[in-house]
């Protein structure tokens, strides 16, 4: 249930002195910038790994830990972050996350050795894990009616691909021109500014003291996700016959099953029991698992193909993906009108189908095309990425509608966990396919074009299966949909984004929030 108590803005906040519409947009800007940075910080070091390896003495088989450790802590801390946000206030945990990101980048910029850098990257993952679920919950509670929420989610979602792409462009340029540490200096500046924005513009959210933290379930879930993500990410380094890798995966899966058992026994489960019985909620988790995993895998494989096989420079490779990132923003603008015109289910299926078509197009884009490769790669990237907001906006909207407003942070945690675990699972599968197609090139075993193409076919198959799953398994009930949308439009969220005015009653405050538009 949502609290009817009005929240108060700290007196130092500009939100106390501006119109509700301006304040709404400032909240959207703050959460979107941090979402952008979560992916920017991951992709920006991708092409700087050789420089880092040489400077800090990483072994060639260990350098990927700069990426892996970020993924592990990011995924592992999502559920606890969602619960902490609901218990102590969404904005408090969000600000704690941005502050953690800032501190971690201080460590990264000054890291004297590889241990210090890995520690800093692990802390960065914790910060990202604290911000991701609470940022989504902040938006869903700030924009309670479906139309304005979908507009906000479209903008929020579109900046994800932009963060990945601009991260590769900026990171590769800085690594070549100013050294790899300059990447973390830039991240330090941006995360510091994000912390200031969050302190200035995020209102206070109601604390849910009636929702104690599920400590046993959270501990088991965190350990299970961490081991699973570790094992899957390490498979590309150790191979599928490694005892350490198999142990991590098996223990991770077993702990996640134990988590389900714990949730059925405890009196205060982290994930409310009604969610496990919600067909639409589970279908949306499958959709985000498939889409998130496919997008992350596609981005990694396509950039590696351009650099390792086609011989492009890192900067040129990154630039080729820029049009796709801006195309995602353009498609995000049209996501909400399309949903209103054709319905959430149809647009979701269309978004998954578009990205699957983009993966199929990539499966035909190889060196055999000759001079057309740059143009073809750019165009196929646009096809793939343009479906991102089209698929994610209805997915988020449907998922959040199945959840009580007070549980949106945990729902956001599950959303992001499905995304991260999907990325690890599908990338591991793609790496296994590529490893089967290696050949000796000048004494070095490299992945052949057939290996990359097989990986793109895997991505297309996963996305196609997800589209079919949504078509077959998700059937929205018209009456239930209207009822839920009416409840949301009339709800008094835990957030009062208008100026504090004690002379107005809670009903008037709720009406001002529900009527506000972007």
From Swiss-Prot:
Domain of life of the native organism: Eukaryota
Lipid bilayer topology: Multi-pass membrane protein
Localisation: Membrane
Transmembrane regions: 27-47, 65-85, 88-108, 123-143, 152-172, 183-203, 212-232, 242-262, 281-301, 315-335, 347-367, 380-400, 409-429, 455-475
InterPro entries linked: MFS, MFS_dom, MFS_trans_sf
Glycosylation sites: 233
Induction, per UniProt: Expression is induced upon voriconazole treatment. Expression is also induced during germination.
Gene Ontology, cellular component aspect: membrane
MF annotations from Gene Ontology: transmembrane transporter activity
Chief location category: membrane
PROSITE patterns (alphabetical): MFS
Record's keyword terms, sorted: Glycoprotein, Membrane, Transmembrane, Transmembrane helix, Transport
Function: Major facilitator superfamily transporter that may be involved in A.fumigatus adaptation to azoles such as vorizonazole.
Family indicated by similarity: Belongs to the major facilitator superfamily. EmrB family.
PANTHER family: MAJOR FACILITATOR SUPERFAMILY MULTIDRUG TRANSPORTER MFSC (PTHR42718:SF9)
Name used for this protein in its record: Major facilitator superfamily multidrug transporter mfsC
Name of the gene this protein is made from: mfsC
